[in-house]
A protein has these predicted regions:
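Bacterial N-terminal signal peptides that target proteins for export
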Residues: 2-16
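N-terminal signal peptide c-region/cleavage motif recognized by signal peptidases
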Residues: 22-24
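N-terminal (or domain-start) structured segment
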Residues: 29-122, 182-214, 221, 303, ...
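An extracytoplasmic/periplasmic, membrane-proximal ligand-sensing/linker region
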Residues: 34-36, 182-186, 223, 249, ...
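Solvent-exposed, non-membrane alpha-helical residues enriched in polar/charged side chains
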Residues: 38, 58-61, 65, 83-86, ...
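Short coil/turn segments
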Residues: 46, 100-101, 139-144, 166-171, ...
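Hinge/capping helix and adjacent helix->loop/strand transition within the periplasmic-binding protein
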Residues: 60, 87-93, 106-198, 247, ...
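Short beta-strand->loop
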Residues: 118-128, 187-191, 209-210, 219-257, ...
Length: 330
């Protein structure tokens, strides 16, 4: 066999191989999903992230031809469920719904050299599903209408012993609470709780003075006047609470932070599957029924691209790194 025939034979073999790979990829895209999809929620049932996940999962089930079931895997501030997700096969049949605490937990654990995963390398962004504003709350017994009045109250009354609650060490409210203490030079003690529900109960009872969480966790109580809203961390005032100032308006720009719920897949999930998931998430959150329910929760339907989600995640991780290092929380 001369050189020409050997080269021709090699070219034919390569061509057949590439065709087979192309057909395999096309078949994979056409058969996905081939079984039920599990959506991990790394928090207990009943919270904002869980509610949003169930709304999205229901609509995805209707359009994808396979059940999308929510699997609550709570613990360690969301890290247990996220770690399970990082180890799942990258085939699109296991996805994750997480929130603002995802980049925070990753940064805090990395700085402490105990992170089981890397948000930037172990996960693939699918979409920011919704924006959910973070709101600073207080017991109605607190004689301050916003965060600056609270700071003045504490500075001028050294005998006051106020506490602020969070959903646990290293949580969003814990970090923001310490940032608030440093920015305003006030003394206020951190009390960690095991979730948003017990924190809210202590606020309602007046045994806890200050708290903070996603708006949907306390919107009903704020509207009823049983919990007071001191500020939101959003970049602009939110329609549900038009009289509540933003932290930036109050001269506390370092506390500005967009709250969100988003969908992730394992790293190395094929691009065509990411694109399909993105399309399905956008369709779900923009369905009129879902948008109405989200609005009732104080959330805003988004449905971003994967690249927009990646950019936001990087921005918030940089922000959290700066806050944690500045306050030596690591």
């Amino acid at each position: 066999m001369n050189l020409f025939h050997r080269q021709l034979r090699t070219s034919i073999k390569l061509g057949v191989l590439f065709c087979m790979l192309g057909v395999h990829g096309l078949a994979q895209a056409q058969t996905y999903p081939s079984r039920p999809i599990k959506m991990i929620v790394p928090f207990p049932a009943g919270g904002t992230t869980d509610i949003v996940a169930r709304l999205v999962a229901q609509k995805m089930s209707e359009s994808m031809g396979q059940p999308v079931t929510v699997d609550n895997r709570a613990g360690a501030g969301g890290s247990i469920g996220a770690d399970m997700m990082a180890k799942a096969p990258p085939d699109g049949h296991t996805i994750l719904m997480h929130n603002l605490s995802f980049p925070l937990a990753s940064v805090a654990q990395a700085l402490a050299n105990r992170s089981p995963f890397n948000v930037e390398t172990d996960f693939a962004g699918v979409s920011i599903a919704v924006y959910v504003p973070f709101v600073w709350t207080a017991s109605p017994t607190v004689p301050a209408k916003d965060l600056q009045e609270l700071a003045n109250l504490l500075r001028n009354n050294a005998s006051l012993q106020y506490n602020y609650g969070s959903t646990g060490p290293g949580s969003t409210m814990h970090v923001l609470g310490e940032a608030y203490k440093k920015s305003t030079k006030v003394n206020i003690m951190h009390i960690p709780f095991k979730g948003a529900a017990p924190l809210k109960q202590e606020l309602l009872a007046g045994r806890l003075q200050i708290g903070g969480d996603q708006l949907s966790s306390s919107l009903a109580e704020i509207k009823a006047g049983t919990i007071k809203a001191l500020a939101t961390s959003a970049s602009k005032r939110i329609p549900e609470l038009p009289d509540v100032p933003t932290v930036k308006e109050l001269g506390l720009p370092s506390l500005e932070l967009e709250g969100w719920n988003g969908i992730f897949a394992p790293a190395k999930t094929p691009k065509d599957i990411i694109e399909r998931l993105n399309k399905e998430v956008i369709s779900a959150v923009r369905h009129p029924d879902v948008m109405k329910r989200l609005s009732d929760l104080g959330a805003e339907a988004v449905g971003s691209t994967p690249s927009e989600q990646d950019a936001m995640l990087k921005k918030q991780m940089d922000q959290f790194r700066a806050i944690i290092r500045d306050m030596k929380l690591e």
